[in-house]
């Protein structure tokens, strides 16, 4: 059975926090693909980027995504870049899962992300990098999503409750 809900969105949108709250409300299991990768690799995502490179990480991300879509039936949170490849987009669409785009503005993301070293794609000028990522990713997120939730002014519990309403 495929995931009931797949959460997608940029860094700082609250995919992990909202996902945990949503899973509680739905009495479902929660899986975060970044956490699965970090556990499998015994390294943080930023360490994987530094030690093994982005290409390795993206390959691992696809592997974990394809596996979790096949074995997980609860709430699945994807890393911000996970839906970018054609393979990932196809798998997400074919899963039959409800996809929710958790959106956030730059102003909303900044205090959550902190634009620190733990976000490997946001090094250098993190605000400009984040905006550039969103310019590329937003059309993909929007094309995959059945629902869109702006999380700027919502707590994780409020965003999760809004998703439950959308699912009804």
How would you name each of these model-derived features?
Residues 18:
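Hydrophobic positions on the alpha1 helix immediately C-terminal to the Walker A/P-loop
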Residues 7:
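Hydrophobic anchor at the beta1->P-loop junction of P-loop NTPases
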Residues 94-139:
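A glycine- and Lys/Arg-enriched "phosphate-lid" helix/loop adjacent to the NTP-binding pocket
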Residues 2, 21, 25, 98, ...:
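NTP-dependent small-molecule kinase module
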Residues 80-83, 105-107, 154:
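Short glycine-rich anion-binding loops that position phosphate/pyrophosphate groups of nucleotides
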Residues 15:
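Conserved lysine of the Walker
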Residues 10:
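P-loop (Walker A) phosphate-binding loop of NTP-binding proteins
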Residues 32-93, 119, 127, 131:
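ATP-dependent small-molecule kinase phosphotransfer cores
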């Amino acid at each position: 059975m495929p995931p009931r809900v797949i959460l997608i969105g940029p860094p700082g949108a609250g995919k992990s926090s909202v996902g945990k709250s949503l899973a509680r409300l739905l009495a479902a299991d929660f899986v975060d693909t970044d956490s699965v990768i970090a556990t499998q690799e015994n390294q943080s995502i930023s360490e994987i980027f530094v030690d093994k490179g982005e290409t390795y990480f993206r390959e691992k991300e696809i592997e974990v995504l394809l596996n979790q879509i096949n074995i997980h039936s609860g709430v699945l949170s994807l890393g911000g870049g996970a839906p970018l490849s054609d393979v990932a987009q196809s798998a997400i669409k074919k899963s039959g899962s409800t996809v929710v785009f958790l959106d956030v503005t730059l102003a909303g993301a900044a205090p959550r992300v902190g634009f620190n070293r733990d976000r490997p794609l946001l090094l250098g000028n993190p605000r400009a990098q984040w905006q550039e990522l969103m310019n590329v990713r937003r059309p993909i997120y929007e094309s995959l999503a059945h629902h869109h939730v702006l999380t700027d002014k919502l707590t994780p519990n409020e965003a999760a409750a809004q998703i439950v309403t959308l699912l009804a």
